[in-house]
Amino acid sequence: MSFKFLIESLLLGSISGQIRCGRSSVIPRGDVSYGGDDTDELNMDIMLFAFGTLIVVYIVICIVYFFTKQIATRLITAYYNEHGPGQRISLFSDYDENNAHVHSRRLMENMSLRWPNNLDDADEVRDKLAQLSPEEQFYYKQGEEYIKQNPPFLLNQGLLQQSEDSNPDTTREDPIMNEQTRQYIQEEGAYAWEFSPNPDMPNHTVIVENKTEVSFLNYNYDASISTNLPIPCINKVYYCEFKIFETDGPLNSDENVSKGVISFGLSTQPYPYFRLPGRHHHSIAYDSNGARRFNDSFKLNEQLRTLFPQCEKGDIVGIGYRSRSGTVFFTRNGKKLNEKSVGGHIRGWKFQYLYPIIGSNVPCQIHVNFGTYGFVYIEANVKKWGYAKSNGIKLPPPSYEDYGKDTLLESGGEDNDFDEDFSDGDSDNIAAGSTTNLNDDIIIRNGEILPPPPGFEFTMSPPTGKKIINEEINLDSLPMLPPSYSDDEHHSKNDKSAISGRIIGTSRNLITDEASFDSVDNDNEDENDHERDPEQFSEFDDYESRMHGI
């Protein structure tokens, strides 16, 4: 009751002008008059005040609603343009790893909505499909079914942008161009890209040599092969060249103009390996017959069929991709091709992963350059549009062409050269019967003298304080007669063996001196023997007889 009285007092005081000089005069309840005129005046003022308040609130609500509607309309329109009208809008991430296959198929359908083509209109496809042969219809349906069963891996651009703006620790790693792949590209450079055939492809259809030399062995049926890595999409422009190195006859002859085709292009993966590029969704190609195909498997009009010049053996076709704008351009033999007659280059063709692809239905050999060596297109060399550096940071193998610059190999080369010179220089002398002294000084190429080879005189130190006598040991220094083993010559045998022991290894002078000395000793011994007692001889004879008996 007191709260109601306070409100009435404030209202009456404000209306009657009793609030003066910042002060409010509260009128007691008993002094308030509730006459009829005052009551009507009070109710009118309250109604006017309430009505004005409602108008102000309504205007504020209308303004908020208008701005909210505009913002929501723009957000929803942008979301539908990017994800399609069939997608559910959610404030949270609706990506489910368990439904990755369904998610990829939805993204593929959304990409088709962004770049409409002849394959998306069912009525138009039905009419054009009827114009194809039964075999072509079969392969077209097989290719479309292959893409439906194996949708290309596409990342949601909105999720990618969100992950870039969020905390780096919580970002989702790129499953293809991850840190390991980037490290591999940094080490290998442009050699990181190589063509890999599909495992389901028939044997001996495509042979890959040296990573980028592709040989097609198929005849009268389509086959295609793509690289193991996509375009990095880090730089602004990427460029590669395809050289028709070898063909099985002319490509554009009167008999082969409608059958033999080699296609060079870009596509998403996986792509039907039994179809040429440019025939199905998310692929573009330059055909060797001069046509440009962009998601079109049917008969082309005259402008697209003759847009580019025809290719033959030795021609070089280049494909450039601008990652910022999604523009694809083509070159032939170093000259950029004009596409204004069909509306210019294809623009806005942005994908997270695009792979270089080659297709053919005739035997041929194609060499591809991703930046390992110079391009024929000069602008690509100047602006360095290759997929990566030519060699990367990995050290190349040593070159064996100039082996003389290597220190180890140079020393080996000198030894070989000396051996050849020695054999060549001495061959004439050896044939003439001359001998070569091994103790002669050997002079090498640099003018240095090598030490003589080691001999027996250096195997042991010579005796000091004695005169060294050079002697020659041969068969003449040995005794001529064999030793006698008879009883009568027992003493002479012992003497000769002693003499022969002294002869071996001594000089001739020493031999003569010792021989004379031994003869004197023998004479003295004979005299002593005659002077000995006969009993001693008898004892000696008994001893010898016992020895013979034993």
From Swiss-Prot:
Keywords of the record: Endosome, Glycoprotein, Membrane, Phosphoprotein, Protein transport, Signal-anchor, Transmembrane, Transmembrane helix, Transport, Vacuole
Region (Disordered) residue spans: 479-550
Positions carrying Phosphoserine: S519, S538
Pfam families in the record: SPRY
Keyword Transmembrane in record: yes
Signal peptide: none
Top-level taxonomic group: Eukaryota
Keyword match Signal: no
Family named by the database record: Belongs to the SSH4 family.
Protein name, entry field: Protein EAR1
Taxonomic classification: Eukaryota, Fungi, Dikarya, Ascomycota, Saccharomycotina
